[in-house]
Amino acid sequence: MRRAGRSRQFSSVEEAFSTSAARPGPRGRRSGRENTAKFVPATLSASTSFSRIEGISSRSVTLASPGSRSGSGPRSGPRLGPRNRSTSRYRWVPAAAGWTVGVIATVSLLGSVSPLIRYLIKVPREFINDYLFNFPDTSIAWSFVLALLAAALTARKRIAWLLLLGNMILAAALNVADIAAGDNTAAEIFGENLGFAVHIVAIVLLVLAYREFWAKVRKGALVKAAAVLVAGDVVGILVSWGLVELFPGTLARQDRLPYVVNRVVGFALADPDLFTGRPHVFLNAIFGLFGALALIMATIVLFQSQRAENALTGEDESAIRGLLELYGKNDSLGYFATRRDKSVVFAQSGRAAITYRVEIGVCLASGDPIGDPRAWPQAVDAWLGLCQTYGWAPGVMGASTQGARTYREAGLNALELGDEAILRTSEFKLSGPDMRGVRQAVTRARRAGLTVRIRRHRDISPEAMADTIARADAWRDTQTERGFSMALGRLGDPADGDCLLVEAIDRDGSVVAMLSLVPWGTTGVSLDLMRRSPSSPNGTIELMVSELALNAESLGITRISLNFAMFRSAFEQGAQLGAGPVARLWRGLLLFFSRWWQLETLYRSNMKYQPDWVPRYACYEDARLIPRVGVASVIAEGFLVLPFSRRDKVHTGHHPAVPARLAQSGLLHHDGSAPDVSGLRPERTDAEEARSRLPEQVRVRLAKLKVLQRNGVDAYPVGCPPSHTVAQALDADDQQDITVAGRILRIRDFGGVLFAQLRDWSGEMQVLLDNSRLERGRTADFTAAIDLGDLVEVSGQMGFSKKGTRSLIVTDWRMIGKCLRPLPNKWKGLTDPEARVRTRYVDLAVNPESRELIAARSEVLRSVRQTLFAKGFIEVETPILQQIHGGATARPFVTHINTYDMDLFLRIAPELYLKRLCVGGVERVFELGRAFRNEGVDFSHNPEFTLLEAYQAHADYRVWIDGCRELIQNAAQAAHGEQTVLRPGADGRLQPVDISGIWAVKTVHDAVSEALGEQVDPGTSLSTLRKLSDAARIPYRAHWDAGAVVLELYEHLVEDRTEEPTFYVDFPTSVSPLTRPHRSRPGVAERWDLVAWGVELATAYSELTDPVEQRRRLQEQSLLAAGGDPEAMELDEDFLQAMEYAMPPTGGLGMGVDRLVMLITGRSIRETLPFPLAKPH
C-alpha cells in the first residue's frame, strides 16, 4: 500500500506544471508588471511624457562590457539590471533539484521504451520508487510530468517548489508510518530510514531555499485544458481497455479496467502487485503513450491560451504609437512594435516601453525599446524584472547599436546578427558602374511595359485594398506570414494609413508586384512586405525600389530601410582576397544553408543598391542560453510553427499595460490609433530639462520673461526706428524730443531716481529716470523688468544730472529685447581670446575695441573699392564652386554636387575666370571676394579669407607696384585718418608707423644673396644652392629644381625677416607657372611679392599670355598633381581654350585683404575677422 499511497501525490500535476515551458497567462503577466514596475502615473503631457534624443551608430561584432566575457559565464562587473544573480548560499538548489528530477525523467522515459534499460535499472529503480521518489517501471506520461517538473524547478517556479516540497513531506510521512508500523525486514528498515533521512534533508534544503524559487506562472485557460485532458484520458482508457481485452495476457478480467486507468491516468504509480496477473509487455508502453498524448494535448491547449497573452490591447498600441510619433524618427524597426501578437512593458516613467513575446520560456524583446532613449534603461529594468518574476530567459532580436549598448549596460551580452540595408535617397542614382546591374534590370522591366504606382494606404479604397490583400496571400511562398521584429504582419488596417504601397503595373493595368513599407519617423519608410507574381518580368523589384528612391523627394522621404541581411559581414569578409580559412569555411557553411534560408540571396539582393549597412544585434544573458534564444526567435519569426498557433491581427490582449493615469487621461484610443500629441512635442520636454541645468542667473531672467509675458508685455516687439543715435542725441538741443535705443550696461538705482548706461553703435550715454518725470510707471518697474544687457528704447529730452553729466531725461521707455544671459564683467569684459572668438556678438556688445576693428575693416574694404573704381575698374563675381582647382598652388576644399554626381572645389583663387574676362575684352576688372584653402590655421592664416584680384590690360607688373602701394596707403588713410599702420612697440603697446612715400624694391636673388653673404643669381647651379641651404640649415626636397630651392631660401631668410614694406621682384620662372618670363633676364619671371613685417601682403605678375607656353606649364603642374602633390594645379582645358583666343598684355594683382587689415590695425587675423574658424567644443 506504500506505493499506492504515493501514486496519489500528483493526481493533478499536469495542471501544475503545464506552464513551465509555455507562455504565461494574463493574470500572471499583470501581477508581474505590478510587482516589477510600479508605474509613475504618466499622462501624455509636456511635463512628464516624452523627449527626443539622437541615435548613434557603429559597427562591431560584440558589445560585451569592459571587464566581462563576450560569450558566457559570470561577468566581473556588476549587473545593472534587476536580474542580479543570487548571492545566497542556496542558489544552487533550484538547478540541483531540476537536474535530479530531470535525470529521473530521462531514465524513466528510456526505461519505458526499452526493455533492456528497464531490466538494467530494475534494482535501483525499485529502491527509489519504494523509499525515495515515484519511479514506475514504464510510464511515458509520468516521464512527461517529471520533465515539466524539472523544467519548472530549473526556472525557479514557485509552484514547482511547492509541489516538490509537498511530495517530499508526504513521502517522509509515509516512511514514518511504515517505520512506526514495524513488522519490516532489516532491508526494509534500512531503506525506510535512509529514505526518511533523504526526505528530511531535501525538505530542509527546500525550505531554506524558498527565496530562490521566485518565479511565478502566468495563468492559462485551466478549465479548457482540463476538459481536453479528461477527454483525452477517456479516449485513451477506452482504447487501452479494448487492447487489453484483445491481449489480456494473465491479467484478471476484474483488474483490467483499474489496471488501464492506473497506466493511462495514474502514471503507473500504483504497485503492480495490487493487480492479478500482467498483460503483454508492449501494452504498458502504449498505455503510457496514451496518457502522455492526453497530457501533451492539454498542455498545448494551455500553451495556446497563454500565447494569447502575447497580444496588445488597444490602449497599449495607442500608447506605443504616441511614443513612436514623438521619438520614432531614429528607429527603422520602431513601427513594428505595433504588431499585435506581442506584449508590452513600460518604463516606470511611462516614457519608454519594450514589446516582447514569450516562447519556450524565453522572453524575446523586439528590437530597441520604444520611446525616449533617456528612459530606455528604465524600460529594460522593468522588462528584466518581468523576466525574473516569471523565470523567463531574456533575449533580444534586432537591436540597434544604441539599443544593444543599453541592454549590455543592464547585464546582457550582444552578438551581431547581420546588417540592415539603408538607402539614402539623396545619394541614390542609377548612373555609375556600381549600379550597372540595377540599371539594366530597370531597363528590362520598363521595356516589358511596367510602370510604378505609389500610394499611401489611406488613399486606397477598401475594395482595392481587399484585392491587394488577396494578391499578397496568393503570391506568398509560405503557408503563413512570417516576422516578429522586422515585419508588421497585416495589411489593410485603418490604423496603418501612413504606410506606403508601391505597385508594379503591366501594360494591361494588372498589378504584378508590390512593396508595402511602414513609416520610419516622418521622413523614412521601412520595408514590410515584398510580393511579386510568378509571371512578372525580370527587374520588377529593382524597378519598384528605384522608382521609390528617385521619387522620394515628392513623398517627403529621405531614407528607405530595405531587407535585413543576416551574417552580411561573413559573406563579405569570406569572399575577400586573402581571407583566412576560418572566414572561408564560415562563408561556405552559410552558402550551404542558403539553399533553404536565402541568406546569401538577401545579402546580394540588397547589396546591388549600394546601401549603407547598419548592424543589428541579438542579446542574451548567458552563452548557454544562445540555442534556446535562437529556437525562440525561430518560433517568433514564424520559421517554426507550433501546433494550434496563430498570429493575431486584432487586439486580443486582456489587460492594458499602460500606466493607470495615462489610460485614464482620455488621450489613448481603444482601437489602437495614435493619440493626439500635436501639442506635446518633445522639444518642450527637452527645453524644460535643459532649463533645469541652466545657470541660476539665466533661470532668473527666464522667470522675469514669463512674468512680463503674463502681464501682456511683448519683450521682443516689432522694430521702430529711433529718432537719434546716441552720438546725435549728445549733440542735440535740450528741448528737443529724442528717442534712442540701445543696450543697458549699468544700472544705479537710488529709489525715486535711477541712472542707467545705454550704448548703441555710435556711442554710450547716461539715461536718467525720475518718478516725477515719467509719464507712466515708476522707476521700480524699470528695475523689476530690466537686467544688464537688455535692449531698451527710451524717450525724453536731453539735460544734465545734478553732477553735471549730460543725460537723457526719460519720460517713457519700453523693452525691445530681453537678454537671457548675463553679460561679462562690466569692467574687464571678455578677456579669454578663445571666448572672444566663439562669442563675437558678446565681445562686440561690451568691447569698444572690437567695434573699432569691425569699423576699420569696413573702411579698408570701402577704400579698396573706391580706389579701384576711381581708376576705371569694374567689379565682377566669378564662381566659388569650380570643377578644377587652379589659379594658385594650394590644397583645395572638396565638395560634391549630387545633381551631376561630381566633385567640386571651393575656389583657391578667382584668377582663371578673371582672365577669361580679359580675353573677352574687359580691360580693367577686379573681384573682392572669398577664397578657400585647406591649409593651416595660425595668426596670419584662416581657411576662409578675403582676396582681391585685379587685372589691367596693357600694363605689367611694375605698374602694379605703384597701384598696390596706393591701395594700401589709401586704406590706412581711411582707417586712421593718416597713412600709418599700427605695430607693437617695445612696451607691447601698438604704436603708429608711417608708411607714406615710396617703398623699397629688391630682386629676389639680391635679397637672398644679402641674407646668405654669398652671391646668388638665376644662373647659380642647383648643387651650389643645395650647399648654401645646408650651410644655412634650410631643408629642401630632393626633387626640387634651382628655382624651388631659391624660393625656400627666400621664404626663410628674407620674407620672415623683412620689416618695412618691400617689393621683392623677379622670382624664378619654375615657381611662377602663370607668369610671363622676364623680358631681359633669363631664368626669372616678371613677378613681385610685397612683404611687410614678415607677412606677404600682395603679389603681382606680368601675366603669361602665350597659350602654348601656358599649356606646357600647366601640363607640368598636372603631372605633379597626378603624382600626388595636393597643391599642384590641375589642367583646365576650358581656360587654355579661352587663352587661345588671345589675351592682351596684362598686369595682375593679388592681395590678401585680411592681411591688409592685420597690417593696418596691428592685430591677428582671428581678431580682425568677425567670425574666424574655431575648433569645435
From Swiss-Prot:
| Biased composition regions of type Low complexity, renumbered to the chain | 65-85
List the residue ranges of the region (Lysine--tRNA ligase). 677-1177
The organism's superkingdom is given as Bacteria
List required co-factors: Mg(2+)
What would be one Gene Ontology cellular-component term for the protein? Answer: plasma membrane
The record's annotation in CDD domains points to: LysRS_N
**Cofactor: binding comment:** Binds 3 Mg(2+) ions per subunit.
**Region labeled Disordered — which residues?**
1-40, 61-85, 673-693
What reactions does this protein catalyze? tRNA(Lys) + L-lysine + ATP = L-lysyl-tRNA(Lys) + AMP + diphosphate; L-lysyl-tRNA(Lys) + a 1,2-diacyl-sn-glycero-3-phospho-(1'-sn-glycerol) = a 1,2-diacyl-sn-glycero-3-phospho-1'-(3'-O-L-lysyl)-sn-glycerol + tRNA(Lys)
Entry keyword DNA-binding:
yes
Q: Where is the composition biased (Basic and acidic residues)?
A: 681-693
Q: Where is this region: Phosphatidylglycerol lysyltransferase?
A: 1-676
Membrane-crossing residue ranges in chain numbering: 93-113, 135-155, 159-179, 189-209, 227-247, 281-301
Q: What is its EC number?
A: 6.1.1.6, 2.3.2.3
A Pfam family (short name) is: tRNA-synt_2_TM
Which stretches hold the DNA-binding feature? 738-816
One GO molecular function term of this record is: lysine-tRNA ligase activity
Q: List the disulfide bonds.
A: none
Q: Does the keyword Plastid apply?
A: no
Classification via NCBIfam families: lysS_bact, PRK00484.1, PRK02983.1
Name recorded for this polypeptide = Lysylphosphatidylglycerol biosynthesis bifunctional protein LysX
The source organism is Mycolicibacterium paratuberculosis (strain ATCC BAA-968 / K-10)
